[in-house]
Amino acid sequence: MKTIYTIIICFLLANVTNAQERYLTKNGAVTFFSSAVVEDIKADNNQVLSIIDAGSGKMAIKILMKSFMFKKALMQEHFNENYVESDKFPKATFKGTIVDFESIKITNLETKVEVKGVITIHGINKEIVIPANIIRTEESILVKGEFNLFVADYNIKIPSVVAKNIAKKIKVTFDFNHKPYKK
């Protein structure tokens, strides 16, 4: 009987420890920017879900494509219906690991890191290494940075009629302020 209680207590403590090691944000920010000959295109999404396991440095991100907001409604419509096909591919995801996360000290200092993993956009999976800056404190894990994506890598077709309006290389910036996850 004592063995059963010991197992149950160990299981419960393990779950409590794991819960304390996860950091989450539901309002992370991702922006993409396309600089082209005819016009610049910028879209913001402030409803990005991101979680970090502080024990392992594993990170997962989920972005709802329809949550990107554009300056012009027509740009948003074309983005969702014609390019990323949001009804067919409603989200973009990233699953990876912050390299050498365990060596990042809990301070208020910004540390340069690399995040390695797989990004999925438009149903296409690509391995990627993203440079980022991280600030790790007792209360939060802030991860921010920028990188470039190529539209062609994700099988996103741009009609030749508007090819001059959209850059082939898209600049992506992100800013996630993770707080301890509490169930």
How does the language model describe each region?
Residues M1-R22:
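Bacterial Sec-dependent N-terminal signal peptides
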Residues Q20-K183:
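Low-complexity, acidic/polar, glycine-enriched regions of mature
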